[in-house]
């Protein structure tokens, strides 16, 4: 199935039914009075998170979603039937926002989470409600209210604990297939990965974490070059980033330090918050480096790269060093998961506050250019 992580849709809730202006007419009841029923409410449109769905492809082509209108009221105090609701099932991790106002409507982070996207209109009142001591035969009634109509942007950010960064052909797909149940396409040419892959890494009974592999980045990605920039958003929810570096490139003219520096630069240009995330350096393809040269090559790389954070040396192909890396990741996530969730909740709250901020004097809104 094609991976789609962004879509735009229109949701239209049903209109409420009109109230009825009817009089009771029965034999032997000369003053029957009003008996007009209310109109039914319009159907609403809901979104529900479903962990069994992993793409927004259904909404790339089905762009309009309508709920039914409520039925009109009738005589004999008959109320109109309410319109049927419409439920849209979306992947866990979907962010829903209003394209016209910029309002953040929902962030679907849990399975079966249900959110109203457009509310159906209220039904109109029948003339039964307008009867009084001075108006025994009212002819008044009210029409149903129109349902909400919204243009929405759907944006999927996969929920992963760990994100993989690196140039094309750095060995990210080989690594995720080596340590998890993911089966990405693997080949000896760049840009093999064209869409994010998720894998569950198990380090023991009831001990696991989710890792995300996105297409490789290239220099200029923040400005749109290559494929990886389209999927960097999927790393924004992760707790730690693994920066994979090919320590033994086939092309001897390629400098691993220059490539690693370019990746860090693109990360910073795309999102400062993403750049500030905990990041570990993973030096891959050690099996391609002669044993007597490994220590010197690693030391030279770290010295020229100027890295003083966590470093792991692995071979994704042979599995060397992968087990120790996975245990270190799990221990780190276990220790920092509460802080990570709190920070993510604060970021979401700040986003909501920003979007709901009142317009500034002169009609300008937050984020407008001066």
From Swiss-Prot:
Residues 128-147 are annotated as: Disordered. It is found in: Cytoplasm. One of its GO terms (molecular function) is GTPase activity. Mg(2+) binds at residues 173, 193. Its main location: cytoplasm. Pfam families: GTP1_OBG, MMR_HSR1. Its EC number is 3.6.5.-. GO terms for biological process: ribosome biogenesis. Its cofactor is Mg(2+). An essential GTPase which binds GTP, GDP and possibly (p)ppGpp with moderate affinity, with high nucleotide exchange rates and a fairly low GTP hydrolysis rate. Plays a role in control of the cell cycle, stress response, ribosome biogenesis and in those bacteria that undergo differentiation, in morphogenesis control. Monomer. Belongs to the TRAFAC class OBG-HflX-like GTPase superfamily. OBG GTPase family. This is GTPase Obg.
């Amino acid at each position: 199935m094609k991976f789609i992580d962004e879509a735009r849709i229109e949701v239209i809730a049903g209109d409420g039914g009109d109230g009825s202006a009817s009089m009771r007419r029965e034999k032997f009841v000369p003053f029957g009075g009003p008996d007009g029923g209310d109109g039914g409410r319009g159907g609403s449109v809901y979104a529900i998170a479903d962990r069994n769905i992993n793409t927004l492809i259904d909404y790339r082509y089905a762009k309009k979603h309508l709920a039914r209108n409520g039925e009109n009221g009738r005589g004999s105090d008959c109320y109109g039937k309410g319109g049927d609701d419409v439920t849209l099932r979306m992947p866990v991790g979907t962010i829903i926002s209003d394209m016209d106002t910029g309002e953040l409507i929902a962030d679907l982070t849990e399975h079966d989470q249900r959110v109203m996207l457009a509310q159906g209109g209220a039904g109109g009142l029948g003339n039964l409600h307008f009867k009084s001591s001075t108006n025994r035969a009212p002819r008044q009634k009210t029409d149903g209210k129109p349902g909400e109509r919204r243009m929405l942007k759907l944006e999927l950010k996969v929920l992963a604990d760990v994100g993989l960064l690196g140039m094309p052909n750095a060995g990210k797909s080989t690594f995720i297939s080596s340590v998890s149940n993911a089966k990405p396409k693997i080949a000896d040419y760049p840009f093999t990965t064209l869409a994010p892959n998720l894998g569950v890494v198990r380090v023991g009974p009831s001990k696991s974490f989710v890792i995300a592999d996105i297409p490789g980045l290239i220099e200029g990605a923040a400005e749109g070059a290559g494929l990886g920039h389209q999927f960097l958003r999927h790393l924004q929810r992760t707790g730690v980033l693994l920066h994979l570096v090919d320590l033994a490139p086939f092309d001897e003219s390629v400098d691993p330090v220059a490539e690693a520096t370019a990746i860090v630069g693109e990360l910073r240009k795309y999102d400062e918050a993403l750049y500030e995330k905990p990041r570990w350096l993973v030096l891959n393809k050690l099996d391609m480096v002669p044993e007597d040269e490994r220590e010197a090559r690693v030391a030279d790389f770290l010295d020229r790269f100027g890295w003083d954070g966590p470093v792991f040396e692995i071979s994704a192909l042979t599995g060397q060093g992968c087990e120790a890396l996975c245990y270190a990741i799990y221990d780190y996530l276990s220790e920092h998961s509460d802080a990570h969730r709190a920070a993510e909740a604060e970021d979401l709250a700040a986003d909501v506050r920003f979007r709901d901020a009142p317009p500034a004097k002169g009609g300008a809104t937050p984020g407008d250019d001066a």
